[in-house]
């Protein structure tokens, strides 16, 4: 599949404006196609980034630390691949290192990469956990995402405050309940 030109993308926005009954030539909408393309370039910038590159900087043998490390409350906005409507929420990530750790900002950057793609929450949860697991090789990874979905509040069932939760565990978190409980108890205190 070849990528459309910027002009082709702008024409597609004009077509959508006509489809909803608007005049793309009226004053308030003249620059809308350009603005939409600029917004989409930023919003969907995760396609041009590789999680592995973010996780390449590792620290080995840092005080032999082998207990739970977590980053909680990572805010994100992503877009549902079914309706191209936003869903936003919070990600909590924990891992138990084996022989290396990463800088704390790297976990937030991983969330940004996957959130800035057309996405479903379940897949995003899995992608975050698996990218940390594959690149760090920790004893285990735990990820929980809680999000509000505009596709439920703006259309369809019209439920405003329904929160969807997804969790994914690898390694020791998947194998031993006590580690899952430790993670869930930690994030419950937020």
UniProtKB/Swiss-Prot annotation:
EC number(s) recorded for this UniProt protein: 3.5.4.16
Oligomer and partners: Toroid-shaped homodecamer, composed of two pentamers of five dimers.
UniProt cross-references to Pfam families, sorted A to Z: GTP_cyclohydroI (PF01227)
Enzyme class: hydrolase
Family to which this protein belongs: Belongs to the GTP cyclohydrolase I family.
PANTHER family: GTP CYCLOHYDROLASE 1 (PTHR11109:SF7), GTP CYCLOHYDROLASE I (PTHR11109)
Keyword line: GTP-binding, Hydrolase, Metal-binding, Nucleotide-binding, One-carbon metabolism, Zinc
Top-level lineage group: Bacteria
NCBIfam families named among the record's database cross-references: folE, PRK09347.1-2, PRK09347.1-3
Pathway, per record: Cofactor biosynthesis; 7,8-dihydroneopterin triphosphate biosynthesis; 7,8-dihydroneopterin triphosphate from GTP: step 1/1
Cited HAMAP family: FolE
Binding site for Zn(2+): 80, 83, 151
Gene: folE
Protein name as catalogued: GTP cyclohydrolase 1
Chemical reaction(s) catalysed: GTP + H2O = 7,8-dihydroneopterin 3'-triphosphate + formate + H(+)
UniProt xrefs under SUPFAM superfamilies: Tetrahydrobiopterin biosynthesis enzymes-like (SSF55620)
Gene Ontology terms for molecular function: GTP binding; GTP cyclohydrolase I activity; zinc ion binding
UniProt-listed GO biological process terms: one-carbon metabolic process; tetrahydrobiopterin biosynthetic process; tetrahydrofolate biosynthetic process
InterPro entries documented for this protein: GTP-CH-I_C/QueF, GTP-CH-I_N, GTP_CycHdrlase_I, GTP_CycHdrlase_I_CS, GTP_CycHdrlase_I_dom
GO CC, any one term: cytoplasm
């Amino acid at each position: 599949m070849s990528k459309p030109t910027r002009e082709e993308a702008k024409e597609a926005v004009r077509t959508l404006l006509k489809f909803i009954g608007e005049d793309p030539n009226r004053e308030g909408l003249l620059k809308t196609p350009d603005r939409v393309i600029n917004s989409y370039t930023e919003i969907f910038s995760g396609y041009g980034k590789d999680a592995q590159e973010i996780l390449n900087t590792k620290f080995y043998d840092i005080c032999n630390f082998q207990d739970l490390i977590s980053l909680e409350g990572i805010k994100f906005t992503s877009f549902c691949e079914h309706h191209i409507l936003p869903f936003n929420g919070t990600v909590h990530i924990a891992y138990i290192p084996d022989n290396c750790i990463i800088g704390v900002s790297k976990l937030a950057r991983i969330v940004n990469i996957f959130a800035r793609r057309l996405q479903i929450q379940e897949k995003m949860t899995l992608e975050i956990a698996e990218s940390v697991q594959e690149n760090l090789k920790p004893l285990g990874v735990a990820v929980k995402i809680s999000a509000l979905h505009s596709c439920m509040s703006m259309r369809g069932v019209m439920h405003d405050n329904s929160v969807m939760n997804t969790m994914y565990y690898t390694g020791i978190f998947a194998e031993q309940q006590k580690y899952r409980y430790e993670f869930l108890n930690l994030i419950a205190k937020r």
